[in-house]
From Swiss-Prot:
One of its GO terms (cellular component) is plasma membrane. It is found in: Cell inner membrane. The keyword Cell inner membrane applies. Residues 191-616 are annotated as: TRAP transporter large permease. It is a multi-pass membrane protein. NCBIfam families: dctM (TIGR00786). Is essential for lipopolysaccharide (LPS) sialylation and serum resistance. The keyword Lipid biosynthesis does not apply. InterPro entries: DctM (IPR010656), DctQ (IPR055348), TRAP_DctM (IPR004681). In the N-terminal section; belongs to the TRAP transporter small permease family. In the C-terminal section; belongs to the TRAP transporter large permease family. This is Sialic acid TRAP transporter permease protein SiaT. The chain crosses the membrane at residues 9-29, 36-56, 83-103, 117-137, 153-173, 196-216, 244-264, 288-308, 332-352, 357-377, 407-427, 431-451, 459-479, 505-525, 527-547, 552-572, 587-607.
Amino acid sequence: MKYINKLEEWLGGALFIAIFGILIAQILSRQVFHSPLIWSEELAKLLFVYVGMLGISVAVRKQEHVFIDFLTNLMPEKIRKFTNTFVQLLVFICIFLFIHFGIRTFNGASFPIDALGGISEKWIFAALPVVAILMMFRFIQAQTLNFKTGKSYLPATFFIISAVILFAILFFAPDWFKVLRISNYIKLGSSSVYVALLVWLIIMFIGVPVGWSLFIATLLYFSMTRWNVVNAATEKLVYSLDSFPLLAVPFYILTGILMNTGGITERIFNFAKALLGHYTGGMGHVNIGASLLFSGMSGSALADAGGLGQLEIKAMRDAGYDDDICGGITAASCIIGPLVPPSIAMIIYGVIANESIAKLFIAGFIPGVLITLALMAMNYRIAKKRGYPRTPKATREQLCSSFKQSFWAILTPLLIIGGIFSGLFSPTESAIVAAAYSVIIGKFVYKELTLKSLFNSCIEAMAITGVVALMIMTVTFFGDMIAREQVAMRVADVFVAVADSPLTVLIMINALLLFLGMFIDALALQFLVLPMLIPIAMQFNIDLIFFGVMTTLNMMVGILTPPMGMALFVVARVGNMSVSTVTKGVLPFLIPVFVTLVLITIFPQIITFVPNLLIP
């Protein structure tokens, strides 16, 4: 069983490394030998579909898919257990339907993939049913644990018997499933989409993972309206991952992991300490400055909080800082990551909005610096009020030594941005270059990265990618319903009726996102609302590059606000302190964040000036 439990990790890690090698070969072949590999992108995308699916399976086994537990945490224990049982039953149905629709789309696939020698696209669609069967096995494993620990009323044997019965019906009497078509009994017409949206909100807020809740709501909609088109719609589950720009996401995740594994984060912190530690509030400034430097390498807020957090909090405690400020600064400064290039959030926005990722990278830099300065100003005020001590000023020799040790790490953002603008590689390829560069300096310069830790880092990146992959798949499927019913246009009409200017619209959108961010994870929120908000921005002639940066900053506020503030939980865990302590500490730092958000909303030129100047 030990080896079976490692199956996805070994296979996913191997495929991850294969994609890594293929894309490195592509860049070298084009830039060094001037002979691009025409098959490399298609093969990398095909393998990424499998990596994403395997990551979903790992997250099913570990029960790590994003869900909202705000309401369930308020429930009495028995009701919470009953609710969790119902949630697991819905997840079981979702996985079975993944297998069902996976088989149907596989059987219907027939087009060749020319770049891969004309092989059938069945190779892409096979990922859904094959890995979904593995997901079912992992789900049953997880339910064994849930039943033993008293989290569910249903034993694993119930799900095993149910799976056998459902598979028997699927293969021998598939027409029986037609009884589930609601349109056979009642015609709801245009009201169907509202019923589906209501069901989605209810099941999401009682704890169904966000990705699965989107899948259920969309299938419910099709069962009430156009079941005959559901097969074509479910193809988007697979096609959504067959995207070259999305390949940047797992490799920026990998870069952040390698920065921690290869000893790079510690050197970044030491350089920031030598540079800023002697000022009033010095260790707080070091914390914020290190986050700015690290953000230019990983592009992830939670990677910053988890990677640098433990190191930063320990150093601040040793310098005499209170726990609330240690946690508050660490949590607040991590939101710099999604603004400063490279940024995973910007990549996802660029894919959703079909905007230039290079322009988004540049556009986020100035707001990122503004947030940095604003947080430092608040830190200075608090440190002066509480009388925190300064650290001794670093000598010129110490400063030069720390700079020398961190030099290769600091080059990472310059390498990424310089490579993109020089045309050496695309924004997607920049993630591959960043990861490869992290391997080189971790293995050969700092000599702290081993081959085993590299493989384990790939496995960890694959598992995190699985959480993102489920969101991408199901939100694309959900988007089909939104598009068919023109929900985005209906929402836009409401904004048009209420708002009389672009600024009013931006204020309304900011207020909406700030409210939703308190209850919905930032990643989930990005996938859920952007497809509906982007058409509104377009209708009011709002620059979509500016809109992407503004919404990204706004959504990052959500990871700092309870009850769903993920950064609060991450910092509390790595700092060994309570969430309430971190929350208390982060509150004053929300003021400079809000001030910056208001500033860029009123003056969008702060964001758009530089990218428009560099990329007309």
